[in-house]
């Protein structure tokens, strides 16, 4: 059991966490023909949009209610109604995600009442689903905001079971053959989600991914050239069939509450996994798919498993005993920590952006809830060879002279990293090779001493100072 160490500093010096509204917006960006609408100031939403654009290198559909100093005091309900009506009239979306921010939460905005006022004033937009999410900036992190959005999507868009799901025969009549629900966590990249879909379909199953960022944020050109709404993602019509699925697969402990809500509404049995990185986690997931599909392990999956095992043998000497420092949101931190621990590496520092109860189960002495400054201090104190963090950890890695493995959100200083697959047999194998190569090619050398009396050329003195 790991000890969870809470922060004692008065402020975050080098912030690790990203706000809840960004996480909630990310969840809606994984739905087809959707517009996330943040109820807050224009500048805050612009900053969030810039975060997404730098990470994904693509246009991002994101709007704001544009609260200002006047509406912050006297109320911004009219802004919300006007924004919803404008988006419905101009863009004709299937779904609008109405996300509160720290500003509107501190103001005390009554979002459900405002949505009711919009419905009363504009009944002709009744077909557009408006999903409100309470996601203040002052609590949680990207992962928790994302989880709140998924929970809201389940509550507002997944129909309740119309028959008694305790009666098997009556339920079987409405079950869609071989369809499974998949609750996808915030830690998964577009590459991860694509790999997960292929993994499930290899067993002859049809997954309904909620949400599906692989179909909307994987970086692809469209014939229209530009769309004001999300292009690609989970269809609203597919979400409305989730109560007829055969089973539900839940990835990540952050989605436990959303999984509970889905089980309450549909009565469908669910299978929960902390992560899908590493041989043991992959084997557990594959065995579950075998049980659901009622088939033996497909040869293609067995082939990938054998490739991963070979990679583990190849990389054991480089990763065994390596000293690693990891900083991420809770789900990703747990997945990476177990991955490195399974390969014989020593996780000397584990820093989470926000507190989560399941972090106590990790195979480390302590998990610090803090920022990247905490990571840097711990990594320096324990001589970490590898820093695993988002792009904001690059400066800490440079100062420490350690290798830097980029993962999480945001990644803005490396092309293609946002789309890498980390999960499954193939993703774990790729992560093994990348980590081993980083450690093998990164040398923490001591610079040679040069006497002040050394006689050398001006160029040599510039490149090799005393």
Residue ranges and their predicted role:
Residues 1-466:
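An N-terminal assembly and electron-transfer interface module characteristic of large anaerobic redox
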């Amino acid at each position: 059991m790991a000890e969870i160490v809470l922060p004692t500093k008065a402020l975050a010096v080098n912030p690790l966490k990203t706000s809840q509204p960004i996480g909630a917006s990310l969840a809606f960006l994984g739905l087809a023909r959707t517009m996330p609408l943040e109820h807050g100031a224009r500048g805050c939403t612009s900053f969030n949009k810039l975060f997404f654009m730098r990470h994904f290198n693509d246009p991002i559909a994101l709007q704001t209610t544009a609260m200002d100093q006047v509406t912050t005091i006297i109320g911004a309900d009219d802004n919300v109604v006007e924004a919803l009506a404008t988006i419905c009239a101009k863009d004709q979306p299937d779904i609008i995600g109405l996300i509160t921010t720290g500003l509107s939460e501190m103001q005390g905005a009554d979002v459900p009442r405002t949505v009711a006022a919009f419905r009363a004033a504009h009944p002709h937009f009744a077909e557009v689903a408006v999903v409100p999410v309470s996601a203040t900036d002052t609590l949680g992190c990207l992962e928790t905001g994302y989880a709140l959005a998924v929970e809201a999507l389940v509550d507002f868009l997944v129909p309740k079971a119309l028959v008694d799901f305790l009666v098997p025969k009556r339920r079987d009549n409405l079950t869609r053959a071989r369809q499974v629900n998949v609750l996808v966590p915030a830690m998964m990249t577009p590459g991860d989600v694509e790999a997960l879909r292929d993994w499930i379909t290899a067993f002859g199953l049809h997954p309904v991914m909620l949400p599906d960022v692989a179909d909307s944020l994987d970086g692809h050109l469209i014939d229209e050239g530009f769309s004001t709404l999300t292009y690609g993602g989970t269809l609203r019509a597919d979400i409305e069939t989730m109560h007829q699925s055969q089973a539900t697969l839940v990835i990540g402990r952050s989605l436990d509450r959303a999984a509970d809500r889905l089980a309450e509404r549909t009565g469908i049995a669910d299978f929960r996994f902390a992560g899908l990185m590493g041989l043991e986690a992959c084997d557990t997931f594959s065995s579950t798919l075998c049980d659901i599909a009622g088939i033996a392990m497909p040869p293609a999956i067995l082939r990938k498993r054998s490739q991963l095992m070979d990679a583990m043998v190849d990389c054991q000497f480089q990763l065994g005993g390596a000293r690693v420092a990891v900083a991420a949101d809770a789900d990703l931190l747990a997945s990476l920590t177990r991955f490195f621990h399974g390969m014989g590496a020593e996780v000397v520092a584990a820093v989470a952006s926000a507190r989560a109860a399941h972090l106590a189960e990790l195979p480390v002495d302590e998990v610090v809830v803090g920022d990247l400054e905490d990571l840097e201090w711990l990594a320096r104190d324990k001589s970490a060879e590898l820093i695993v963090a988002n792009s904001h950890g690059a400066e800490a890695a440079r100062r420490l002279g350690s290798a830097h493995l980029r993962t999480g959100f945001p990644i803005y200083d490396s092309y293609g990293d946002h789309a890498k697959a980390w999960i499954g047999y193939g993703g774990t194998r790729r992560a093994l090779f990348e980590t081993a190569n980083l450690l093998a090619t990164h040398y923490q050398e001591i610079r040679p001493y040069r006497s002040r009396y050394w006689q050398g050329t001006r160029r040599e003195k510039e490149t090799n100072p005393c």
